[in-house]
Amino acid sequence: MKFLTRLYARVCLDLADALDPAGADPADLRLRALSHVTGGGLAANLARVLPAGLIADVDRSGWVVPPVFDVVRRLGDVPWEDLEGTLNLGIGMVAVVAPEAADDAARLARRAGVPAWVLGTVHETGDYAPRGRVVAGTKGVDGGAVDVFGSYRTR
């Protein structure tokens, strides 16, 4: 059996160079944050890189969860909420970018062989009505929050 781990360093560095060339004014930076989704799941890892006062919405139906996670869920009788709070469910890296840079960022990642799409949108918390499970304040970080809503797709 062979297990593979995707390495994101090169694509993240290329993304930073493409979106924010050296010498760019810090006020104009389009790559806002990177979140390597490891232990703790997607929402907790993403919430930690967002500043307090911001919330990201993530629609669970926005990607197809790799089959191995559904097998674990079914054979282990593990609820989706427990899986999403522990595992990455197929999303290993999230780039938080300015809205106008989203298509360019996804295109660059895909050219590098990394599947990419717009995962959600970042909002100010005062202007946002959550639609699902809100995750914030994880691992002692007083940062932003993530609203995970909808249903996972396994096919």
Residue ranges and their predicted role:
Residues 2-155:
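Glycine-/charge-enriched secondary-structure boundary and capping motifs
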